[in-house]
Design a protein with these regions (language model features):
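A shared catalytic/ligand-binding motif for oxyanion handling
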Residues: 1-305
Length: 305
């Protein structure tokens, strides 16, 4: 199945005219899951959700704001995903979803990160605890209020401890941060720009959605750009890639793999470069296997028969 997820810091949902604009945009974007950060709403009702997303099949879960600060709303089309379990933390809203079309189970988290360094560490602890609890493929997104690299904030040249902590979180959980089409930054005002909103996901989540991409949309009614993640699932009946032990018996195999690996050159974050190199290696292994052995699946089936 194909899946579209929208993430957007809307900077408040109190104004009726603003909600009407957002409703029209939601209708145009046609996402399956919609996440809004900084709602500034302490209470969200079904009627309020309907004022944003007119879909009869919409379901939702939210984290209320503290007065006029913060707040997260996650909405989804229940014809596309079923919510098996949910967890509302101090900085995040999470759901354990099951796809209606193919029964794939995965975890989903929308984040609104704090601006204070000592609180950010509580965010990483909150997310890490959730990941170990559910232990399924994971997609985490939102406004983290921190960047990974100095290049992601205009005018910044040095790493900060907050950046190192964010990178450590990404590395520990093996998350991928793929390039974003449509623009470099996700937040801007008259003098500053930064990429503080993003999608991250685990490799086993990407395995199910191998044609994944993220794109920045036009900035309207907020100083944050909406971003959308679009993914196509594995076609039904497609055999997952797996390493064949017989390859190790081929003379020069390990040297060939090393030469392939050293030849791959990609630009981006360390996790993205690693993911792209693994994809390239998988493609080369498949081509080499067909030349060296033919179709392994056919041979195995023939042997059984």
């Amino acid at each position: 199945m194909n899946l579209q997820i929208l993430s957007w810091n809307v900077r408040g949902l109190h104004e009726r005219d603003k909600r009407l604009q957002i409703k029209n945009l939601i209708r145009m974007w046609r996402a399956d899951i919609i996440c809004m950060q900084e709602t500034k709403m302490e209470l969200i009702t079904r009627g309020f959700v309907r004022s944003l997303w007119g879909c009869h099949y919409v379901d939702w879960v939210y984290l209320g704001s503290l007065g006029a600060s913060g707040g997260i709303l996650v909405m989804w089309d229940s014809r596309v995903v079923e919510n098996l379990e949910e967890a509302v933390g101090h900085y995040s809203v999470s759901c354990r979803f099951k796809n209606v079309g193919d029964n794939f189970e995965w975890a989903f988290t929308s984040v609104y990160g704090p601006n204070v360094d000592r609180e950010r560490r509580l965010l990483w602890e909150e997310l890490s605890g959730l990941h170990s609890w559910w232990n399924v493929p994971w997609c985490v997104l939102g406004d983290f209020n921190v960047v990974c690299f100095p290049t992601e904030r205009l005018g910044t040249i040095n790493f900060t401890q907050a950046m190192h902590d964010f990178l450590d979180f990404i590395s520990v959980h093996g998350l991928l941060d793929i390039p974003m089409a449509g623009g470099r930054y996700t937040w801007s005002n008259s003098v500053s720009r930064s990429k503080i909103d993003c999608f991250l996901f685990s490799p086993n989540w990407e395995d199910h959605y191998p044609k994944i991409s993220q794109r920045r949309l036009a900035k309207v009614v907020s100083d944050h750009f909406p971003i959308i993640l679009e993914g196509g699932a594995i076609q039904k009946g497609r055999r997952p890639f797996c390493f064949e032990n017989m390859w190790l018996q081929v003379e020069g195999f390990m040297g060939k793999v090393k030469n392939w690996w050293d030849s791959y050159q990609f630009q981006g974050t360390p996790s993205y470069r690693m993911a792209m190199k693994l994809k390239a290696l998988k493609a080369d292994l498949k081509k080499w296997n067909e030349l060296e052995f033919g179709n392994v699946v056919v041979k195995k089936n023939t042997t059984v028969e």
